Amino acid sequence: TEHRMKEPFFVLATQNPFEMDGTYALPEAQIDRFFFKIVVDYPSESMLETILDQTTGAEITTGKQTITPQDILRFQQRVREVPIASHVRRAIARFVRSTLPSEPANPAAVREYVRFGISPRGAQAVVLAAKARALLDGRFNVSLDDVRFAVVPALRHRLQLNYRGAAEGLNVEEMLLELFDAQARAAIP
């Protein structure tokens, strides 16, 4: 059965730590469908007080609409219109390929510690996020800095370490940035 959802449609989800009872790992194919993984720190004491005030009192707090669905659709279309220079696109393609453990020329750390590299869907997420960041910064062109900004939130959940990499405590975010930086340096015209 297929149900057509009204546009724009997107889902925000939370991920509980695997250590919690009743929590199961998602298959890689499902993980890859999440555009971003944003890590939210535990609220500060003052923020926690605000949360308690706004959620446990008699007065019901409601949000205020600041953007319409049509605004979101227009922004999504505008993001897709942002051009990306060939050297930036090449850096992304080379970076994504550098995460594949099956490639003999890739760094030893990738071949030894990575179970699953970045998929084409991950590369698409990086491009779209970098384009959005450029627009939000008032520019109609994507820089390597925009791409670097997008790498961790768009890919931290997609690069899967193997057992050995996890056991040795490798940091996925650091690995992603190191791999991207190497390709970005090589791509500068």
Task: Label the predicted regions.
Residues 62-123:
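Conserved AAA+ ATPase small/helical "lid" subdomain
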Residues 55-58, 79, 95-99, 154, ...:
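Alpha-helix boundary/capping residues
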Residues 101-189:
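C-terminal engagement/docking regions of AAA+ P-loop ATPases
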Residues 51-52, 92, 150-155:
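Short alpha-helical scaffolding segments that buttress acidic/His motifs in well-ordered protein cores
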Residues 1-82, 131-133:
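Canonical AAA+ ATPase core
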